[in-house]
UniProtKB/Swiss-Prot annotation:
<keyword id="KW-0863">Zinc-finger</keyword>
<keyword id="KW-0862">Zinc</keyword>
<dbReference type="Pfam" id="PF06200">
    <property type="entry name" value="tify"/>
</dbReference>
<keyword id="KW-0539">Nucleus</keyword>
<dbReference type="Pfam" id="PF00320">
    <property type="entry name" value="GATA"/>
</dbReference>
<feature type="compositionally biased region" description="Basic and acidic residues">
    <location>
        <begin position="252"/>
        <end position="271"/>
    </location>
</feature>
<dbReference type="GO" id="GO:0043565">
    <property type="term" value="F:sequence-specific DNA binding"/>
</dbReference>
<feature type="domain" description="CCT">
    <location>
        <begin position="95"/>
        <end position="137"/>
    </location>
</feature>
<keyword id="KW-0010">Activator</keyword>
<dbReference type="InterPro" id="IPR013088">
    <property type="entry name" value="Znf_NHR/GATA"/>
</dbReference>
<dbReference type="GO" id="GO:0008270">
    <property type="term" value="F:zinc ion binding"/>
</dbReference>
<comment type="similarity">
    <text>Belongs to the type IV zinc-finger family. Class C subfamily.</text>
</comment>
<dbReference type="InterPro" id="IPR010399">
    <property type="entry name" value="Tify_dom"/>
</dbReference>
<keyword id="KW-0804">Transcription</keyword>
<protein>
    <recommendedName>
        <fullName>GATA transcription factor 19</fullName>
    </recommendedName>
</protein>
<comment type="function">
    <text>Transcriptional activator that specifically binds 5'-GATA-3' or 5'-GAT-3' motifs within gene promoters.</text>
</comment>
<feature type="domain" description="Tify">
    <location>
        <begin position="33"/>
        <end position="68"/>
    </location>
</feature>
Amino acid sequence: MAAEPPADGRDPPADDGAAGDGAVESAAAEALLSAASEQLTLVYQGEVYVFDPVPPQKVQAVLLVLGGSDMPPGLVSMAVPTTFDEKSTTVAARRVASLMRFREKRKERCFDKKIRYSVRKEVAQKMKRRKGQFAGRADFGDGSCSSAPCGSTANGEDDHIRETHCQNCGISSRLTPAMRRGPAGPRSLCNACGLMWANKGTLRSPLNAPKMTVQHPADLSKTGDTDDSKANLCAEHNQTTMKTDTEMVPEQEQKADVLPPTKEEDSMATS
């Protein structure tokens, strides 16, 4: 025979094996109901309204009327908004804190061209000076090395740099615009030989190189004397030509005064 339903109209209790998860969920809901009082708290325009007692079914019905989402039975759904509010408040607080830190850092930043005199002062104090002024590398090298051997080595290096010769044609570095790199290394060829070596990879024949010699001061004085003598001869020649021209001017004027006879005079002479 089928089991008759109870008189109160309630469902009979299910067996232990058939209850399963439903019993666990009902137990959890009863525990939450007993732990939290059935109070409804509403906050509207800064005012707080508390209603006691309010069952969850009424709250769900009100939310459905207002167009909210459907709530599951039990108070578990009522605890979700509180946790969401807590998360939102913590996120907002973190944002405010990060914004304050950013503003503090931005105050320290300066995108304008600020002259830092302290750094300039340190750099100026580290720089070498000569007679109260900033000295370059060349001046500092000349002034710092006051001893005789050091000065002699520096002068020897300068002379070696100045007095180099082309290894191909033998021309001096003073007679070429610049010494260039060659097969033997830097500053081993003259300008012409270095350019040919860089462009074609071959060295020009020394026979085509111009023969240029350095003139000594005695030779320069001799050439200067010869130039002066040539200049004096040219000046004397110009003076003699000017004198001859002035002497010939009166004769030319006399010839210009003697005019040739006209046609009328010729006809009268013939008649």
